[in-house]
Amino acid sequence: EKKLLSKLDYKDGFSLYVGIPFCPSVCSYCSFSSSPIAEWKDKVESYLFALLKEIRAIGKMSEGHRPDSVYIGGGTPTTLEAEQMDRLLKTITENFDLSNVLEFTVEAGRPDSITEEKLAVIRKYPVTRISINPQTMQQKTLDLVGRNHTVAQTKDAFYLARKLGFDNINMDLIAGLPGEDASDMEDTLRQVEEMHPDSLTVHALAIKRAARYGQEGR
């Protein structure tokens, strides 16, 4: 991070964040603004139309400036279909000068939203980093918090990304998930270590009012 920070253009640079507010399911601990993709499938095209229009407008407004970083988050960006992801990335690359970008991240957070076709689309563009986020490698916990995917899917998605040439893969974990103890976290770390991600981000569980757990008073 220090190496990247030293290269930032604090005068003319900026960071570009693009949000995709859809997920395969909404985790019970999550307070982010996101909705289940199945319930909003017929609205995704309308959202994408408005988003691409905004990206073009911001591109014109920022002429003379170059982004230092690009981050596509959410939600889960890979809930978009491959063709929709292609349009999104194409619009970004056409409307911004990316020659100064130090890091271009696409969150591929939910393994159950990752396909070979979507990863192949991402590889077409100057994306330098993806994030595949199991949060835990304990199946009992995944089921409890409503993530609706398996540990095996996490591993399959990770190794598929490696096979397609992704050489900067982050993984996110959450410490303190409901029902987990130190031995569960130790086992999760062991399994992740065996996969050799390029970076690991560990968050402490924080229940906020917007999360289902927060509304239930847990």
Where are these regions (language model features)?
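Conserved non-cysteine loop/helix-boundary elements of the Radical SAM core domain that shape
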Residues: 34-218
